[in-house]
């Protein structure tokens, strides 16, 4: 058992999520084509400040994340501060925890408040897969470095003649794990095979996610937490996530072919998240500061946990490790929760984790616990759909989930919710939030 956690300031004040906002999420090279992550981040933070009538000078710290790094803006957090009217003295730094990045930025702001260093802060994350750093081959990079040391034409020629045509080709960002060479999709295929996750079940989960997300949009549930964007060249408004299948039909999913194991695989473009562009942010305050400024919090952070597991097998099983720690720290069980959202990187990964939550064998052999975390009640699970439908701008997903969960809990009259996500590198996050 993990010791109980107290997420309060030294004076016993809770850490409040006062507001949250995100851009619509866009499939790569669509509505946000050509818009870098730093501009997406500035866009959503500025809109959140304006929407909630927050004086930018009140912000004491901003922690923001980005997974697909841009060399020209390595500290996206500081660029957001400088681009949104905050004080030049506002502290800002950037974090990266793969798909759990904005859970990390949220926790960092919370911990600054717990230490008494700040009372108002912003956390979030943004990513653009449409504006990615295109590199050069290692041979060309070395040659370009060597060229700087040459003086004569002959010396330059001797450096360049070692290059082949292949060395001159651009190198796109890596999609595989550095340590294993495996892509996330290959890991999802492995998990599907190892845990007997059928193609039919994966397609059903994807269809469910799209259907619930479409229903949430149609019922107006997301309108208050998704801004209208006007990306360059500013000719049209972008208002809704463009990956959601508003006319999703289960039979349509069966038509797609596997992507990562073309002969025996079950993971397709329809039951996996697409490459996505977008940004999200949350405004956080200590309980007393929110009250003094006249804000009613959306909710509070009750507990959180991070986990790291093996990358060679079941690399995306992290929620099954992080969740029991977060529950212990909150003094809760799975049955105590009102709602659950698990990030859907792949339907296969999500279904494998659902299985392991309910497995005594997994708990005993992998977690060193006597009993399973518990069987998930699907009536509480991803009730508005999740990443399979909305898309997954890596660093933006965590704060998207936090805002969406708190708003839905409030619509239901309050309660507590679990948020959990797997991440590249065998990492994972889990957070429990609560409302009044």
Swiss-Prot record:
The keyword Transferase applies. Pathway: Lipid metabolism; fatty acid beta-oxidation. Its main location: cytoplasm. The active site is at 99 (acyl-thioester intermediate), 392 (proton acceptor), 422 (proton acceptor). One of its GO terms (biological process) is fatty acid beta-oxidation. Gene3D superfamilies: 3.40.47.10. Catalyzes the final step of fatty acid oxidation in which acetyl-CoA is released and the CoA ester of a fatty acid two carbons shorter is formed. NCBIfam families: AcCoA-C-Actrans, FadI, PRK08963.1. This is 3-ketoacyl-CoA thiolase. It comes from Pseudoalteromonas atlantica (strain T6c / ATCC BAA-1087). The lineage of its organism: Bacteria, Pseudomonadati, Pseudomonadota, Gammaproteobacteria, Alteromonadales.
């Amino acid at each position: 058992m993990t010791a109980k956690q107290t997420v309060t300031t030294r004076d016993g004040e809770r850490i409040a999520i006062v507001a949250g906002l995100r851009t619509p999420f866009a499939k790569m090279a669509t509505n946000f084509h050509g818009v870098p992550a730093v501009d997406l981040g500035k866009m959503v933070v500025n809109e959140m400040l304006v929407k909630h009538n927050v004086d930018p000078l009140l912000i004491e710290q901003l922690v923001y994340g980005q997974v697909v790094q841009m060399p020209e803006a390595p500290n996206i957090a500081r660029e957001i501060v400088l681009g949104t009217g905050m004080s030049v003295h506002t502290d800002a730094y950037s974090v990266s925890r793969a798909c759990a990045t904005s859970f990390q930025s949220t926790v960092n702001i919370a911990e600054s408040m717990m230490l008494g260093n700040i009372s108002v802060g912003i956390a979030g994350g943004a990513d653009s897969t449409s504006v990615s750093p295109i590199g050069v081959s290692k041979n060309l990079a070395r040659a370009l470095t060597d060229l700087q040391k040459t003086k004569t034409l002959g010396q330059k020629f001797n450096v360049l003649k070692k290059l082949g045509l292949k060395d001159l080709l651009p190198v796109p960002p890596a999609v595989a794990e550095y340590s294993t060479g495996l892509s996330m999709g290959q890991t999802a295929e492995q998990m599907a095979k190892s845990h007997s996750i059928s193609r039919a079940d994966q397609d059903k989960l994807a269809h469910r996610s799209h259907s619930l997300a479409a229903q949430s949009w149609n019922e107006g549930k997301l309108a208050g937490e998704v801004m209208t964007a006007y990306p360059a060249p500013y000719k049209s408004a972008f208002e809704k996530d463009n990956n959601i299948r508003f006319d999703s039909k289960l039979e349509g999913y069966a038509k797609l072919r596997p992507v990562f194991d073309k002969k025996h695989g079950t993971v397709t473009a329809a039951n996996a998240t697409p490459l996505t562009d977008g940004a999200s942010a949350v405004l956080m305050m200590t309980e007393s500061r929110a009250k003094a400024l006249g804000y009613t919090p959306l909710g509070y952070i009750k507990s959180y946990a991070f986990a790291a597991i093996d990358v060679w097998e079941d690399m995306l099983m992290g929620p099954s490790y992080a969740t029991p720690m977060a529950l212990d720290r909150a003094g809760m069980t799975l049955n105590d929760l009102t709602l659950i959202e698990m990030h859907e990187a792949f339907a296969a990964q999500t279904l494998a984790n659902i299985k392991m939550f309910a497995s005594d064998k997994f708990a005993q052999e992998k977690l060193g616990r006597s009993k399973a975390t518990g069987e998930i009640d699907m009536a509480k699970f991803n009730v508005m759909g999740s990443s399979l439908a909305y898309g997954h701008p890596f660093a933006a997903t965590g704060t998207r989930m936090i805002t969406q969960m708190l708003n839905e809990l409030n619509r239901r009259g309050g309660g507590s919710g679990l948020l959990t996500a797997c991440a590249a590198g065998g990492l994972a996050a889990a957070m429990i939030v609560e409302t009044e």
